[in-house]
UniProtKB/Swiss-Prot annotation:
InterPro entries: GDSL (IPR001087), SGNH_hydro_sf (IPR036514), SGNH_plant_lipase-like (IPR035669). PANTHER family: GDSL-LIKE LIPASE_ACYLHYDROLASE, ZINC FINGER FYVE DOMAIN CONTAINING PROTEIN. One of its GO terms (biological process) is lipid catabolic process. Its main location: secreted. One of its GO terms (cellular component) is extracellular region. It catalyses: hexadecanoate ester + H2O = an aliphatic alcohol + hexadecanoate + H(+); a butanoate ester + H2O = an aliphatic alcohol + butanoate + H(+). Residues 1-25 form the signal peptide. The keyword Hydrolase applies. It comes from the Eukaryota. Belongs to the 'GDSL' lipolytic enzyme family. This is GDSL esterase/lipase At3g26430. Gene3D superfamilies: SGNH hydrolase. Lipase activity is inhibited by phenylmethylsulfonyl fluoride (PMSF), but not neostigmine bromide (NB).
């Protein structure tokens, strides 16, 4: 009997080592608080500067949803997996429900503050430090208003949710492309990356000081494989790899990611009560782009929604752009007809199909450190 019990334990242990997801505890996160840029913006920039036009949102929401994609983003799939509603943008005052979290991300956001990057990124003034201010204000005001009772109690999070929530970070890509816009060399961009990580680390420390304990951090994508980077910041043919990606741009991203992982390791030691999950988005997206055909995708370096050129990307005519010709409105940048098979949505962001595939890889735990699914991200 004892021998059989020991055998069962050994089999279970081996199974857990091979498939850690199957043996991981569920954390029952009651809320998500997200910080980021357009990769996870669910309506922040649209609420501030006007809605991202149709065909953004065409696939899932069937109308513009504040997202720069035809449908759902990775953060939406994370919410679904945790059994939570999609996150409303903190800046969106129309019909928002913050009972299970809030999204502080806005498209174009950078880690570094405006005095360092606003002239470079040229899009959003809502950098990560501003998102932190918004979050801090949200903690205080949400509880003051929730205590009024009635409908306010239903629309705002419970106080304890702030210490039990999952805190997600997906930001940094715009800090790197900001350097490209200033014609900086790879070495010049790499030189300011430590400052980017200093400021990101400081924000995480401040969230920790306000009760945050579960952190889910994405690294940055292979920049050299994004259609808009290939179009706007071309490199000589000798610096293009076999898959059509710009080698020096990907080298910048890899350096950023290696340093980010080192910072996460340091934060684990420093903030001993916190659980950190570092997610290797770079490797997942690179796998998808370099093995697109094998995985059932088409034209990984060509935007689905765009206007002309090798990469179907035009910085002056972006997805959904229209013109008036003889009193008639004409859409110049339309969606492709095979969006469910495409990788890139608009040359910058990804399609819903791509985001879904990426999330499946994330949730397997194989690309995360520690190798856990999102439901178990409270594990230290």
């Amino acid at each position: 009997m004892e021998t059989n019990l020991l055998l069962v334990k050994c089999v279970l242990l081996a199974s857990c080592l091979i498939h850690p997801r199957a043996c991981s505890p569920s954390c029952n996160f009651p809320a998500i608080f997200n910080f980021g840029d357009s990769n996870s913006d669910t309506g922040g920039l649209s609420a501030s500067f006007g809605q991202a036009p149709y065909p953004n949102g065409q696939t899932f929401f069937h109308s513009p949803s504040g997202r720069f994609s035809d449908g759902r983003l990775i953060i939406d799939f994370i919410a679904e997996e945790l059994g939570l509603p999609y996150l409303n943008a903190f800046l969106d005052s129309i019909g928002s429900n913050f009972s299970h979290g809030a999204n502080f991300a806005t498209a174009g956001s950078t880690v570094r503050p405006p005095n360092a990057t606003i002239a470079q990124s040229g899009v959003s003034p809502i950098s990560l430090d501003v998102q932190l201010v918004q979050f801090s204000d949200f903690i205080t005001r949400s509880q003051l208003i929730r205590n009024r009772g009635g409908v306010f109690k239903k629309l705002l999070p419970k106080k304890e949710y702030f210490s039990q929530a999952l805190y997600t970070f997906d930001i940094g890509q715009n800090d790197l492309t900001a350097g490209l816009k200033l014609n900086m060399t790879s070495d010049q961009i790499k030189a300011y990356i430590p400052d980017v990580h200093d400021q990101l680390s400081n924000v995480i420390r401040k969230v920790y000081s306000k009760g945050g304990r579960r952190f889910w951090i994405h690294n940055t994508a292979p920049l050299g494989c994004l259609p808009y980077v290939l179009d706007r910041f071309p490199v000589p043919a000798s610096q293009i790899d076999n898959h059509g990606c710009a080698i020096p741009r990907n080298e910048i991203a890899r350096y950023y990611n290696s340093e980010l992982k080192r910072r996460v390791i340091e934060l684990r030691k420093e903030l001993s009560e916190a659980a950190f999950t570092y997610v290797d988005i770079y490797s997942i997206k690179l796998t998808l782009i370099t093995q697109a055909k094998k995985l059932g995708f088409r034209y990984p370096l060509v935007a689905c929604c765009g206007h002309g050129g090798k990469y179907n990307f035009n910085k002056l005519i972006k997805c959904g752009a229209k013109v008036m010709i003889k009193g008639k409105e004409i859409v110049l940048a339309k969606s492709c007809n095979d969006v469910s098979f495409r990788v890139s949505w608009d040359g910058i962001h990804f399609t819903e199909t791509t985001n879904s595939w990426i999330f499946q890889q994330i949730n397997d735990g194989a690309f995360s450190d520690p190798p856990l699914p999102v439901k178990s991200a409270c594990t230290r």
